[in-house]
Amino acid sequence: MAALDSEGDAQKLRFGPWLLNAVSSGLYRGLCWIDPDRRIFRIPWKHNARKDVTSSDVEIFKAWAKASGRYEGNAEDPAKWKTNFRCALRSTHMFMLLEDRSKCNDDPHKVYAVASGVPNDRGSGGPVAGALQQQPQLLLNHHDLALENTPTDSTEGVAAAALTQVDLDLLQSVLQHCNISALGSQPTLWAHTGDALPEDALLLPGQDGCLPGPQFQDWRQLEEPLLLGNQPLTGGGCGQDGAGALPVSEECAIPAPSPAEELLFQSANPAPPPPAGDIGGLPPLLDITIYYRGKMVYQEQVDDSRCVLAYQPLDPAVAEQRLVLFPSPASLPDPRQRRYTEDLLEVAGLRLEQRAGQLLATRLKKCKVFWALSQQLEGGEPPLNLLHRDQETTIFDFRVFCTELRDFRDSRRERSPDFTIFLCFGQCFSSTKPKESKLILVKLVPQFCEYWYEQVQRGGASSLNSGNVSLQLSDSFNLFELIEQYHMQTD
């Protein structure tokens, strides 16, 4: 397949104009405009671990690798091409994700729109019109809402911060630094009485990337008050009968790391001190995605070991911090959803920090925050993991992840390790309501974990229950060699 003429001028090339040119060129199968104004386009996005991957499925990623000067002709590395492409796509301000259908079996792809004010290949810079259909109305269970005090009067929020410039080289350099190979007054309340959404609604693609809603919304007024933080949790709320304050679930307690796991965060040779914040040598790359009732409203990749999620940038509680700002809910179509979301955002604040091989969270304000790993929300009663105010809590341990990833590679573990964390603001997770029904949901994905998980999949590991999968990984996959070598030295 012919490549674009601009490939080769890597030093002067910018990703945004290059991608627009590629979409218009018609050279890449599945990469095309899908609206007459040429503001919305689709990108083929088949997972590298699928058996039916062909060269045409990765052609656009390979083309950018060549254009950006990252292509090595003697080694075909589709996963690396795709990672480079994804990092470039996220770091530019020119595009926004409309639909993620990468999990679709027949035609995996993603749909992007050219951001307002950015000219397309025809020079038009008008806004994207009609790309997103109106969102379904609010599904709200008043028992789920959790505030310590009555929210104050709402004010309009501030636009979210711009995406940060992230490059794969940062990940590569940190991995090399660790001697790890990169190769290898209560308002009137309402509750919905119609059909509940499916548990996996967030994963089901709709025509506009939003949640499929019921045909008819039936609302009824509720007499019971909003659940406050100083009230006991009854059977109708988030806890058990007669329960008081929500304890952190003991099921989710992280065991103490073994000496071999500790070694994952130490260089075999003396190394300079870790960067500020002491993240244990791990790259501080964290994908943060914000959803308002199942609809993605913001996404950012934070390259700092510390950040604060907040709504008001001038809030003294978050002064002089790296901010990830919640978008204003003013554009939400449902007035009840808009009001409740605004009330929660006014009293929401959370600090995240990667330190000593862990991801730590501290609630800063009145809005309660519950957290869970994605697999804990797939069936049964989810854990009642509550972040207490001004108390630092470990919500993810990278050492546990590395141990589980090794076991997954060696077929000692059927399921892949879980590295996706969900945070729910003002509502607790429930087995009867999907997470997509929550007013404010935040998804966290550490890039370190995603990168190494993809490396294992490239080596042949699969989360399918295959039973007798033979895993043959390259000798250069030093993450696990490091563990095994340490075991040999200490036995």
UniProtKB/Swiss-Prot annotation:
It is found in: Cytoplasm; Nucleus. Signal peptide: none annotated. It holds the Pfam family IRF. GO terms for molecular function: DNA-binding transcription factor activity, RNA polymerase II-specific; RNA polymerase II cis-regulatory region sequence-specific DNA binding. InterPro entries: Interferon_reg_fac_CS, Interferon_reg_fact_DNA-bd_dom, Interferon_reg_factor-3, SMAD-like_dom_sf, SMAD_FHA_dom_sf, WH-like_DNA-bd_sf, WH_DNA-bd_sf. Induction: Up-regulated by poly I:C. PROSITE patterns: IRF_1, IRF_2. One of its GO terms (biological process) is positive regulation of DNA-templated transcription. Keywords: Activator, Antiviral defense, Cytoplasm, DNA-binding, Nucleus, Transcription, Transcription regulation. Residues 12-116 bind DNA. SMART domains: IRF, IRF-3. GO terms for cellular component: cytoplasm; nucleus. The keyword Transport does not apply. Widely expressed with higher expression in lung, spleen and intestine. The keyword Membrane does not apply. It comes from the Eukaryota. Key transcriptional regulator of type I interferon (IFN)-dependent immune responses which plays a critical role in the innate immune response against DNA and RNA viruses. Regulates the transcription of type I IFN genes (IFN-alpha and IFN-beta) and IFN-stimulated genes (ISG) by binding to an interferon-stimulated response element (ISRE) in their promoters. May activate transcription by complex formation with other transcriptional factors, possibly members of the STAT family. Binds specifically to the IFN-stimulated response element (ISRE) but not to the IRF-1 binding site PRD-I. Belongs to the IRF family. This is Interferon regulatory factor 3. The gene is IRF3.
